[in-house]
A protein has these predicted regions:
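Soluble catalytic domains of membrane acyltransferases
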Residues: 77-195
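Membrane-anchoring hydrophobic helices of lipid-metabolizing enzymes
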Residues: 1-109, 142-146, 151-153
Length: 195
């Protein structure tokens, strides 16, 4: 209920202010949440060459950016409608050179900046694209988020064994797919990472 209330408020105040307020809440979460402490611990391991102040700056910038993404999620349909004026694509010539016949291709990315908007750019380059996604754990948010994504993610492929088969079927059918591959998954063998 809290998340839906926040998204309603973000939508009410508009895209720019919603993004800003989301960023402010993200900063607060980075300072007081257990996730903020986990991020600080991971940064100390990953970037020991940075001072504690620099590590804190990196951590808070990450939390602010994630907060901004959440603030912008309430406006995904608007962003999709205004993509021509809001989105610029650099390096499109590389995609065109790699896919002279139009595809299909596998686009791989991570959760950087507003990762939701990446699909708009891919679709501008190659048309409708299948997107692998993980359903939110919060059942109340699941339907809302899928509806928000309808504007730019017409082919949604849920993560998991069935999704893997659907992903291959989509590629074999001549349609490109996109994956964000930096998520942790509960399946598989555990490994020690960074000590």
């Amino acid at each position: 209920v809290l998340a839906k209330t926040l998204f309603f408020a973000y939508r009410l105040v508009g895209l720019r202010l919603g993004s800003y307020l989301g960023g402010r809440l993200g900063l607060l979460a980075g300072k007081i949440s257990p996730d903020g402490q986990r991020a600080a611990d991971n940064l100390a391991k990953a970037m020991p060459h940075l001072s504690e102040a620099e590590q804190e700056q990196v951590k808070l910038a990450c939390f602010e950016q994630v907060g901004r993404v959440f603030g912008e999620m309430a406006h995904l349909p608007k962003i999709a409608r205004e993509a021509d004026s809001r989105l610029s694509i650099e390096g499109a010539e590389h995609v065109e050179a790699a896919l002279p016949d139009g595809g299909p291709a596998i686009f791989i990315g991570g959760h950087f900046a507003n990762w939701e908007v990446v699909m708009l750019g891919i679709q501008r380059l190659v048309g409708d694209t299948g997107a692998l996604y993980r359903e939110p754990k919060n059942v109340f948010m699941r339907k809302w988020l899928l509806n928000q994504r309808d504007a730019f993610m017409p082919i949604k492929i849920p993560a998991g064994p069935e999704g893997s088969r659907e992903l291959l079927k989509t590629l074999k059918g001549g349609t490109s797919v996109a994956l964000l591959i930096d998520q942790s998954l509960p399946q598989g063998d555990p490994i020690t990472f960074m000590g």
